[in-house]
């Protein structure tokens, strides 16, 4: 059976923390689908298409990775792809508590498991919101965003 994981988020923008999770998760799966979430209630710096294309460009040539947008429940997105696992990254206790609760809900709904990766040392302050803020003020974002995205 093919091991399929999904890694989802708004990725506005995709950070070095997100990239770290993808690269660390990749050896565990035969396929990893990156889902770029679209929520009509949120305002974005980048369009969904721009986010998808930026992430695709980052993993160009990586056959195990696909990237697409979605706007439904994460578990429904996972089921569409035949995924058995949802990949999540956590930076703090607050993140962990939220993701633990989401994992329980997802497991109850579909039986899908959640695989958690902890932020590497020094990456706990890396976030899309910090990357956006720095970029808006014209500051250097190299220590927050991958070179091909920043």
Each model region followed by its residue ranges:
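Nucleotidyltransferase catalytic core that binds NTPs
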Residues: 1-150
